């Protein structure tokens, strides 16, 4: 299996809306041309109001999720306050850069809400971190997802509008990218809560998108 197949075979999305951020992924995991799993988890909660999406090697992604969760909790214990989204992306960036000689095969998004409001960062395998403006997509399905996101995104989306946009963009990627598929996982982060969209609500939003 090539590095490109390992690193990019998925679709993950981040959308900033008026009151928070949406992190969304599909659920297919591949090994070359084979579908290895139809229920892969690609969004992890690493702090109270911060999530991380993963594309790339499953083992690398899971280890990084564990490390980030521990480090973010330690930050809160030591400093008496929650880590910011920017600080968490810097923490992840530094860790990946220190291991660049034996890199983690991942492409990540870190998004959440802190005292400055909602934000999302993309982080590559070498530790390069970039704060994205409003929308971002990673993985092999990202070109198709970006086509929908850039066409339909507008400032100050409501939560419902942002969820529908994420689902629409993922469905576009899943139709054309063989490494993306099986289902959709949506996380909503606001200043009040980190929550996952239930299957029942996902079906309702999907019906609205396809109507």
UniProtKB/Swiss-Prot annotation:
Active site, per annotation: 10
Annotated Gene Ontology cellular component terms: cytoplasm; proteasome core complex, beta-subunit complex
E.C. no: 3.4.25.1
Annotated control of activity: The formation of the proteasomal ATPase PAN-20S proteasome complex, via the docking of the C-termini of PAN into the intersubunit pockets in the alpha-rings, triggers opening of the gate for substrate entry. Interconversion between the open-gate and close-gate conformations leads to a dynamic regulation of the 20S proteasome proteolysis activity.
Catalytic activity: Cleavage of peptide bonds with very broad specificity
Keyword Cytoplasm in annotation: yes
Propeptide segments, given as residue ranges: 1-9
GO BP of this protein: proteasomal protein catabolic process
Pfam families, sorted: Proteasome (PF00227)
GO molecular function: threonine-type endopeptidase activity
Alphabetical keyword list: Autocatalytic cleavage, Cytoplasm, Hydrolase, Protease, Proteasome, Threonine protease, Zymogen
Subcellular location: Cytoplasm
Quaternary structure annotation from Swiss-Prot or TrEMBL: The 20S proteasome core is composed of 14 alpha and 14 beta subunits that assemble into four stacked heptameric rings, resulting in a barrel-shaped structure. The two inner rings, each composed of seven catalytic beta subunits, are sandwiched by two outer rings, each composed of seven alpha subunits. The catalytic chamber with the active sites is on the inside of the barrel. Has a gated structure, the ends of the cylinder being occluded by the N-termini of the alpha-subunits. Is capped at one or both ends by the proteasome regulatory ATPase, PAN.
Family: Belongs to the peptidase T1B family.
Its biological purpose: Component of the proteasome core, a large protease complex with broad specificity involved in protein degradation.
UniProt name for this protein: Proteasome subunit beta
Organism: Methanosphaerula palustris (strain ATCC BAA-1556 / DSM 19958 / E1-9c)
Gene name of the encoded protein: psmB
């Amino acid at each position: 299996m090539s590095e490109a197949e390992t690193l990019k075979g998925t679709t993950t999305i981040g959308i900033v809306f008026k009151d928070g951020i949406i992190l969304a992924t599909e659920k297919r995991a591949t090994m070359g041309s084979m579908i290895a799993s139809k229920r892969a988890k690609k969004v992890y909660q690493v702090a109270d109001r911060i999530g991380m999406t993963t594309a790339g090697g499953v083992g690398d992604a899971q280890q990084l999720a564990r490390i980030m969760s521990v480090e973010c909790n330690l930050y809160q214990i030591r400093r008496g306050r929650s880590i910011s989204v920017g600080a968490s992306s810097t923490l992840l960036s530094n860790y990946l850069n220190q291991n660049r000689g034996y890199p983690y095969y991942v492409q990540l998004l870190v998004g959440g809400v802190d005292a400055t409001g909602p934000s999302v960062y993309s982080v590559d395998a070498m530790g390069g971190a970039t704060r994205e403006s409003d929308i971002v997509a990673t993985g092999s399905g990202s070109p198709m997802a970006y086509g929908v996101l850039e066409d339909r995104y507008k400032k100050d989306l409501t939560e419902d509008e942002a969820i529908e946009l994420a689902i629409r963009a993922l469905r576009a990627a899943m139709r054309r990218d063989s490494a993306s598929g099986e289902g959709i996982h949506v996380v909503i982060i606001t200043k009040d809560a980190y929550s996952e969209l239930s299957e029942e609500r996902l079906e309702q939003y999907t019906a609205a998108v396809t109507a």
